[in-house]
Amino acid sequence: MGSSIKINSISIDLAGAANEIDMVKCDHFSMRGFVAETRERDLRKCWPFSEESVSLVDQQSYTLPTLSVPKFRWWHCMSCIKDIDAHGPKDCGLHSNSKAIGNSSVIESKSKFNSLTIIDHEKEKKTDIADNAIEEKVGVNCENDDQTATTFLKKARGRPMGASNVRSKSRKLVSPEQVGNNRSKEKLNKPSMDISSWKEKQNVDQAVTTFGSSEIAGVVEDTPPKATKNHKGIRGLMECDNGSSESINLAMSGLQRRKSRKVRLLSELLGNTKTSGGSNIRKEESALKKESVRGRKRKLLPENNYVSRILSTMGATSENASKSCDSDQGNSESTDSGFDRTPFKGKQRNRRFQVVDEFVPSLPCETSQEGIKEHDADPSKRSTPAHSLFTGNDSVPCPPGTQRTERKLSLPKKKTKKPVIDNGKSTVISFSNGIDGSQVNSHTGPSMNTVSQTRDLLNGKRVGGLFDNRLASDGYFRKYLSQVNDKPITSLHLQDNDYVRSRDAEPNCLRDFSSSSKSSSGGWLRTGVDIVDFRNNNHNTNRSSFSNLKLRYPPSSTEVADLSRVLQKDASGADRKGKTVMVQEHHGAPRSQSHDRKETTTEEQNNDDIPMEIVELMAKNQYERCLPDKEEDVSNKQPSQETAHKSKNALLIDLNETYDNGISLEDNNTSRPPKPCSSNARREEHFPMGRQQNSHDFFPISQPYVPSPFGIFPPTQENRASSIRFSGHNCQWLGNLPTVGNQNPSPSSFRVLRACDTCQSVPNQYREASHPIWPSSMIPPQSQYKPVSLNINQSTNPGTLSQASNNENTWNLNFVAANGKQKCGPNPEFSFGCKHAAGVSSSSSRPIDNFSSESSIPALHLLSLLDPRLRSTTPADQHGNTKFTKRHFPPANQSKEFIELQTGDSSKSAYSTKQIPFDLYSKRFTQEPSRKSFPITPPIGTSSLSFQNASWSPHHQEKKTKRKDTFAPVYNTHEKPVFASSNDQAKFQLLGASNSMMLPLKFHMTDKEKKQKRKAESCNNNASAGPVKNSSGPIVCSVNRNPADFTIPEPGNVYMLTGEHLKVRKRTTFKKKPAVCKQDAMKQTKKPVCPPTQNA
């Protein structure tokens, strides 16, 4: 009779225990089981230990004092029992009248029985407990078991603890190892002994009653499936939790120990025993009900409550069944009928067997059944609920994907996997590790598959680090639907083994993409979710048709760069290993698959060429810029197969940030101008990109169809191969860009295009990036300018640019003169896609076609343009400082004005010096190679500007400074920008600016400042020729504006200063006080001279 008193802490008074009898102490003593028993028998026993008990511990060096036999029950683990068997019952301290209960008291656990048995002093009676396993088939009725328990324990309370209780715990604790034990199988498979015969065999009743607490106690690590025990013993077992089992395991090294549950309060334990009676034995139906109730406690989809309850019951029963079915059907029955007995299910949940309604990522029913059957020796022997659920008999009405996989799958890993149910239809992309191409199960019924993860992904909960980093590391990127034959592709087209089953989706499928019910392939996706092109570095599963649907709802869809992929990751394995491994597991096959496809071979070549490092840098820069609209479309730039792995190893960018505003990830193959999209594509709004046979870029459709969160997309152009069409104009692309002439550009030839401020030039890394989409730049740069391509070092002919592009290692700065957009030749150092300064006409406050030409802008150069101070949202000067927003980059025809360098802006020049590299094309002084003598040297820093001319000397620099025709802002050691006058536009030009644009207006200095600069330079000329040289016409000005840029500091680099610069700056500070300095020097010299004279 359980006490109504709730005990939060238990202590046992063993006063005088040492005096009563010789005892054998067990290190594995279960305090919990003991207290449960003693608490039942005598509430007074539960008191703090006395000092005498402490002395016992000291004497025999046991962690816990043993209990005196007359008053307390013996608790032994297997090792203790073995020792008792070896030494005889007297060692146990048992009374002579006690009979060997070893035959009956066997409790099975993991091929060994961790049961405490009172061994009779007669050694012939003692037998191995495992050999003496309770040989009753689970088929024995609970009533019989109860009877046996009652008869077996007469002295126990009026109601014996039913075997169902044992079974309940055993069901919780039964593990495949336990049941899998051959001996247990043999024993369990044996026909159950008659209760009468068993009683006869167990003639221990009186012996047990002779001393109240010496009843059999099965302190089992994992309580056996079914053992008739004293109700007290059972209560002890029930209440022991794993305290005893853990302690027992300490001795049982051979056994695999598991924690079954958290430790419950004794009050709960007592309350459990209190309510548990041997007579009221619950059948499996009751067990199912209880478990279902327990299942209801879990979070469930509203429509899935019933199914989830069944599944929960199944989860527990089927798991136990699956684990116990190997050994015997009876075990499963016992396990099923048990565990419900505990009234406090909520707290009693076995953590290991917790029935969770979070569903296993929906493996196909077949796979789930197989997974279960793997551990279920005979599914037909399962308990009815589990059996019905898996075998189809009495099948619970649940969608096929909802069936549970093995319970081995770690629940905490499963918790994030609930099916997304949209309009009652969810497509589950589920694939087991063995399945090469994941099967997509579209279920019209409520699908229990990987809901939580997709929700979280869609909600952006889990996307932040794990998902995005994983995507980034794995090279997953969102890709626009490529429009083949101007037919919008609304469904993911799978390769042979693609992860999503392609369906002929209606054009309006994306339109209604918010409701996943319309697209079977994307059904599991939430509204606004893109179907993402799942492409690893080597497996570009993307076809021309492999569509990355543009996110219609950026907030939810932003993090779902590869939601389907991620879901696959989750679905592939119920555990995180599956998730983590998913990418890896599926890398190889998809990669080969993508390469196997002819359609994607060209895309693969181009898409793979783009390294993730660029994306990472851009994301990092974007983050540092703290732009509210972090819409850097560091879009699905899949690292080239070669560079992808490197990029994985490279910085992992949080794609969540890069995708923060739901920026559609654009395929890196943006190098080609978008092909006009069909009306269907417009209707669908998934922005299928027109696709050129060899062109590798997918461009979004023209601005009218671009969602507002997504930046402007250049209008589609028909003549894409040789030139970029910006806003419907023939804006030539960079010579070496893949769209120009490179059918198969190397990854280095690509650069990520971004807002002008992001433009940076990093040597040897080029990437045509998807257009950086800036919400502020949403205005389509249509028909503002018709760029005329200038090929400074090469012919202005766009064809020549494309030819020049063939040599990726020899980029020459090519500028589109009309737009002032710079066309970078293949020379990787100076490949700049900066179009900002030149692109913006004075009339328009924003760069022309910032995004239209972004595809042509090298990614690293774009990164170099990143300035954390600058905000991309500034309308005039997205890439520049807001204070420059009013500044307009004059069109090509205004190049003279730039040359003249209006002095009105000199007041801002000090700031502009920092901004100079950014304000031009991308607020960065981009150097335009002199057509002949201008040596193009790769700037060490990605964002560093390098202005170098063939030869330059301080004298030349002085001459330049004296000239007033044009002042090029040079990063002198002075804090203020030094504008070196130069008559040769070609010699000194801003990188990213066309010939027409020498400098932004803001860099113009007032005459006064010019004079000051000249004076400063003259002062420093003699002292430090280096900084003065920087102001010379052939200037080497390398400024690293990109905080993400990790490069060697170069002269003139504002952020990366060398010691030389520091020295110069110090001198410059004193340059205006030469006389004072002289006086000070003289004074100092006089002072030291005086003391020696005095001393003399």
UniProtKB/Swiss-Prot annotation:
Domain of life: Eukaryota
Short sequence motif named Nuclear localization signal 3, residue ranges: 1071-1078
Polar residues biased stretches: 315-337, 382-394, 1018-1032
Segments of this protein annotated with the region Disordered: 155-189, 274-296, 315-348, 366-420, 563-612, 629-651, 1007-1032, 1070-1096
Free-text disruption phenotype from the record: Abolished rosette shoot development, reduced inflorescence with several flowers lacking petals, and differentiation of the apical meristem from indeterminate to determinate growth by producing a single terminal flower on all nodes. Altered inflorescence-to-flower transition. Degenerated flowers with only carpelloid structures capped with stigmatic papillae but lacking leaves, petals and stamen. Derepressed seed development program. Decreased H3K27me3 marks but increased H3K4me3 marks on target gene loci. Plants missing both EMF1 and ULT1 have rescued normal H3K27me3 marks and H3K4me3 marks.
Residue ranges annotated as motif Nuclear localization signal 1: 170-177
Tissue specificity: Expressed in mature embryo, root tips, cotyledons, leaves, stems, shoot apex, and flower clusters, with highest levels in flowers. The presence in the shoot apical meristem (SAM) is required to maintain vegetative development and prevent early flowering.
A GO CC annotation given for this chain: nucleus
Sorted UniProt keywords: DNA-binding, Nucleus, Repeat, Repressor, RNA-binding
Sample GO molecular function, one term: double-stranded DNA binding
Region (DNA-binding): 337-617, 866-1096
Locus of motif Nuclear localization signal 2: 281-288
Compartments (UniProt record): Nucleus
GO BP terms in the entry: epigenetic regulation of gene expression; hyperosmotic salinity response; meristem determinacy; negative regulation of DNA-templated transcription; negative regulation of flower development; negative regulation of gene expression, epigenetic; post-embryonic development; regulation of flower development
Bias-annotated ranges (Basic and acidic residues): 281-294, 371-381, 572-601
The keyword Cell inner membrane belongs to this UniProt entry's keyword annotation: no
The protein's role, per its UniProt record: Transcription repressor that regulates phase transition during shoot, flower and seeds development. Controls leaves development, shoot architecture and flowering by delaying both the vegetative to reproductive transition and flower initiation. Participates in polycomb group (PcG) protein complex-mediated (including EMF2) silencing of the flower homeotic genes AGAMOUS (AG), PISTILLATA (PI), and APETALA3 (AP3), as well as of some regulatory genes such as ABSCISIC ACID INSENSITIVE3 (ABI3), LONG VEGETATIVE PHASE1 (LOV1), and FLOWERING LOCUS C (FLC) during vegetative development.
Subunit structure and binding partners: Interacts with MSI1.
PANTHER family attached to this UniProt entry: PROTEIN EMBRYONIC FLOWER 1
Protein name: Protein EMBRYONIC FLOWER 1
Species this chain originates from: Arabidopsis thaliana
Encoding gene, per UniProt annotation: EMF1
